[in-house]
A protein has these predicted regions:
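Nucleotidyltransferase catalytic core that binds NTPs
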Residues: 2-187
Length: 187
C-alpha cells in the first residue's frame, strides 16, 4: 500500500508510524516540521540543501495538525496537507511525510522530538529551521529544551539571514557546523 493511500484511521496511523520508526540501523535524519499549508517548492529546496550540507540519510517532513503559534482559521485540513506534501515528494525515497503529532497527541515540538528520540534511539536527528522561524523561536514552548536536545540547522530564506541569526545568537551558542554534525552522526 502506498504512503498516500493509507486510510485515515488511528490504527492506520499507528501502523504507519511503526513502519517509520522501525530501526534500520543508525541514520542521520533531518526533521522539517511545519504546517505545510500548502507544501511548496521552497520546502523541497531547503530539504535538498539540508540533505547535501548535513549529509542526511533522510528528511522527515512532519506536518503539524495545528501550530500553536498560528490561527487555525485559514488552515487546510490535516489530511489534505499530508496528501499535498506526499504528492510533492512522490518519487523521492529519502523524504518521509507524516504527522507524528497527530499520533503522539501533542502539537509541541519538544514533546515530539522527545518521543522520536525514545522510539529511534540509534538515529541522529537534526532539527531543520528556516531563518525566518529563528526570530520567533524564543516563543516556542520549551525552546531551550529543543536546542539542548537536537542540533538545529538554520536555513537561510530570502529576506531572512543575518537579522535572524543575530536574533537567535544566544539560542545557537555552541551549536555545531554541518561538517561537525556529519562527524557526530557517524561516530
Amino acid at each position: 500500500m502506498a504512503r498516500s493511500d493509507l486510510p485515515d484511521t488511528a490504527v492506520a496511523r499507528r501502523h504507519q508510524h511503526a513502519r517509520l520508526f522501525h530501526d534500520r540501523g543508525r541514520m542521520r535524519i533531518g526533521l522539517l516540521g511545519g504546517s505545510f499549508n500548502p507544501a511548496h517548492e521552497g520546502h523541497l529546496h531547503v530539504t535538498h540543501l539540508a540533505r547535501r550540507a548535513l549529509g542526511l540519510d533522510q528528511v522527515w517532513w512532519m506536518v503539524s495538525p495545528q501550530n500553536p503559534l498560528k490561527t487555525s482559521r485559514d488552515m487546510a485540513p490535516l489530511d489534505m496537507r499530508l496528501m499535498q506534501a506526499r504528492q510533492m515528494t512522490a518519487g523521492i525515497p529519502w523524504i518521509r511525510v507524516f504527522a507524528p503529532e497527530a499520533g503522539f497527541r501533542t502539537n509541541l515540538t519538544h514533546a515530539t522530538v522527545r518521543v522520536l528520540r525514545q522510539r529511534c534511539p540509534r538515529h541522529r536527528f537534526c532539527w531543520l529551521m528556516g531563518a525566518d522561524n529563528l526570530q520567533g523561536f524564543g516563543r516556542w514552548q520549551h525552546h531551550d529544551i529543543i536546542a539542548q536536545t537536537v542540533p538545529i540547522a538554520v536555513l537561510d530564506r530570502p529576506g531572512y539571514s543575518y537579522k535572524s541569526i543575530n536574533a537567535g545568537r544566544r539560542l545557537l551558542k555552541g551549536r555545531k557546523s554541518a561538517a561537525r554534525f556529519r562527524m557526530m552522526a557517524l561516530g
